[in-house]
């Protein structure tokens, strides 16, 4: 299953849709415009919140908590690195490998590739594709993409 994310370049409220390979809306992502620290909400096609992404305000490096059903499901932490951005996902079997800076990387589950994320260049606004090989937790894959993209855009 493939998911396509198209962020609108002039979207003040940072709301964008996530479509499946057939063009159907699967999710909507909404960034809280004036919140400090920055937060995102992911809604399914029935407009029910499935995940929230909340930044830890007092941390040395960027850290986001992924919250599902009121519980912290995972934390994504940008690790200190001199050359290329590196991310650690705590509390989850997922890890990130590849060229995150170029928005071309692989998501691994317990060391085995389960999805790839790539950015389409030269498009109006940011466009991404998540290629989910085995039907993994697509909400978590989407959350990983959103956090990494947001942190990279702030560096």
Cite the ranges covered by each PLM segment.
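Intrinsically disordered, low-complexity proline/glycine-rich segments
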Residues: 1-155
């Amino acid at each position: 299953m493939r998911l396509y994310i198209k962020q609108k370049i002039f979207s003040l409220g940072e709301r964008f849709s996530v479509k499946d390979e057939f063009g159907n809306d699967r999710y909507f992502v909404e960034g809280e415009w004036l919140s400090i620290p920055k937060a995102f909400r992911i809604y399914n096609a029935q407009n029910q919140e499935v995940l929230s992404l909340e930044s830890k305000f007092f941390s040395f490096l960027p850290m986001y908590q992924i919250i599902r059903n009121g519980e912290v499901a995972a934390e994504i932490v940008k690790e200190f690195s001199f050359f290329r951005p590196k991310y650690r996902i705590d509390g989850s079997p997922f890890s990130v490998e590849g060229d995150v800076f170029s928005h071309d990387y692989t998501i691994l589950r317990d060391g085995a590739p389960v999805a790839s994320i790539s950015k389409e260049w030269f498009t109006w606004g940011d466009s991404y594709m998540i290629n989910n090989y085995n039907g993994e937790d697509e909400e978590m894959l989407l959350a990983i993409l959103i956090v990494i993209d947001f942190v990279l855009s702030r560096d």
